[in-house]
């Protein structure tokens, strides 16, 4: 009787257990699968990297880029994890590479011609699928690059010598505009005005207010640098980037006015050949329906801001290095006298200025301005044995690479580092391959002409033994001196031409 009473209870218990076990098993299996997924995610690659930690790692790495700046964060991670390592930006895998063979591979292949950055950030500054610098639409990028390459080579390259020399001479003749009460020269402002004037004369040809436009270019660059890697939720709060949005609008509106004047000059020109230049070519392409008006405006804007943004700072660093190394200055001045003498500089002088060229290269190696390159993988690949998936972001830390391999004295500033030919895989200040800097040849001409004209007229010194090594800098999208710290002026001492050129 008792057994019969317990029998139904037995069946109820076994029924309950049979119902609970599947649910418990499913829960355990799901949890195990989730943990295995996380474990596998962290170990899908042998590439050195910080831990994933349930998604906390990617948040920390992205925050570090926003906090330290792109360049400083890259140096930090390469120092911590090696010359080929992985982090996350915006939740996307990002490789930071400073190994020459890997850098060479990425630059060489066409499936790395795309760049990466925040879509709303690029839209805000007008670079999303427009212009050339961060245009990631392959078809549009190729279309506009043709116009840039044409303007930056051939006749434009030949004309640059005279145009740049005239601009430098004009600005040196009115040096008092950039001198302070102590007689010190604001070299950054001087160089920015020279580079803007030269670019305008060669590529747009419309009179502009140099002082005002240079300030607006700096505001635009600050916005570009600040917004490039910001996460999407940042742009949901317009007050967070109101200042940058206004800076972008300010420059674009001023550029639109200048470009509209250019359109009018084309219409009223008696001969179209008389006003043919970069801007005219783009405007005619717009009329043919090949480019949109917005893209044309962005291309012209980018052409005009490129030199004031980078070359001006590059020459600024060069002059500080010359001031610290008088033996280098002596060698440069001696070569100027030997090659050019008292006559005007000519295009055929460019290839003969070997000391000047080596000085430029060593300056760009030792104290770079653009020390990183941002790319995105457009297809699966393998780099130096590491698998790279399509869509992976890549930052080439070329500034660090230039101090790691090949050079006999990598941590010193010395022309000995270029006494012998340097294989281009070890030195890439302008990049190479399908997305190399379109203006690398014309940039070399501008720097050579600037140094020759300036050093023929002035000896440069720094107050109180200031130097680039002690200078406060910001290493973000590019490496710039911290202009809020001051102490960036130089002393220009007029040369006695007879004595200086026989120096």
Swiss-Prot record:
Cofactor: heme
Annotated GO MF terms: aromatase activity; heme binding; iron ion binding
Localization per Swiss-Prot or TrEMBL: Membrane
One GO BP annotation of this record: response to estradiol
Known EC number: 1.14.14.14
Entry keyword set: Heme, Iron, Membrane, Metal-binding, Monooxygenase, Oxidoreductase
Name of the protein: Aromatase 2
Source organism (scientific name): Sus scrofa (Pig)
């Amino acid at each position: 009787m008792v057994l019969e009473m317990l029998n139904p209870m037995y069946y109820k218990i076994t029924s309950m257990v049979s119902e609970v076990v599947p649910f418990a098993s499913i829960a355990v299996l799901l949890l195990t699968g989730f943990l295995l997924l996380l474990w596998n995610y962290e170990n899908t690659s042998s590439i050195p990297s910080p831990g994933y930690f349930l998604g906390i790692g990617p948040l920390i790495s992205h925050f570090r880029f926003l906090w330290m700046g792109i360049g400083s964060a890259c140096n930090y991670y390469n120092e911590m994890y090696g010359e080929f390592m992985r982090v996350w930006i915006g939740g996307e895998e990002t490789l930071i590479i400073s190994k020459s063979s890997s850098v060479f591979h990425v630059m060489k292949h066409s499936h790395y011609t795309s760049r990466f950055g925040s879509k709303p950030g690029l839209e805000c500054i007008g670079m999303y699928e427009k212009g050339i610098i961060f245009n990631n639409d392959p078809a549009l990028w190729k279309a506009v690059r043709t116009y840039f390459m044409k303007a930056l080579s051939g006749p434009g390259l030949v004309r640059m010598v005279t145009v740049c020399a005239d601009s430098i001479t004009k600005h040196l003749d009115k040096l008092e505009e950039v001198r302070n009460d102590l007689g010190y020269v604001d070299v950054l402002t001087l160089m920015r005005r020279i580079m803007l004037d030269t670019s305008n004369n060669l590529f747009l040809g419309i009179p502009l207010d140099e002082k005002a436009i240079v300030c607006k270019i700096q505001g635009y660059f600050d916005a570009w640098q600040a917004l490039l890697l910001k996460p999407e939720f940042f742009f949901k709060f317009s007050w967070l980037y109101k200042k940058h949005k206004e800076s972008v609008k300010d420059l674009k509106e001023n550029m639109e006015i200048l470009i509209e004047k250019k359109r009018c000059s084309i219409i009223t020109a008696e001969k179209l050949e008389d006003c043919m230049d970069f801007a005219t070519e783009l405007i005619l392409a717009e009329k043919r329906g090949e480019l949109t008006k917005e893209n044309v405006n962005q291309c012209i804007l980018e052409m005009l801001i490129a030199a004031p943004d980078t070359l001006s700072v590059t020459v600024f660093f060069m002059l500080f290095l010359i001031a610290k190394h008088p033996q280098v200055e002596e060698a440069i001045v001696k070569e100027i006298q030997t090659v050019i003498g008292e006559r005007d500089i000519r295009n055929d002088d460019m290839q003969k200025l070997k000391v000047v060229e080596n000085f430029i290269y060593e300056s760009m190696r030792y104290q770079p301005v653009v020390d990183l390159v941002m790319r995105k993988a457009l297809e699966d690949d393998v780099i130096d044995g590491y698998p790279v998936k399509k869509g992976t972001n890549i930052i080439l830390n070329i500034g660090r690479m230039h101090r790691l391999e090949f050079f006999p004295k990598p941590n010193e500033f010395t022309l000995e580092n270029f006494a012998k030919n340097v294989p281009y895989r070890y030195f890439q200040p302008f990049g190479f391959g399908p997305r190399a800097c379109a203006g690398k040849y014309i940039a070399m001409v501008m720097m050579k002409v600037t140094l020759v004209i300036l050093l023929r007229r002035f000896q440069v010194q720094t107050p109180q033994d200031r130097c680039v090594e002690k200078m406060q800098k910001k290493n973000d999208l590019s490496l710039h001196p911290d202009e809020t710290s001051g102490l960036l002026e130089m002393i220009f001492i007029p040369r006695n031409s007879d004595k200086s050129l026989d120096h």
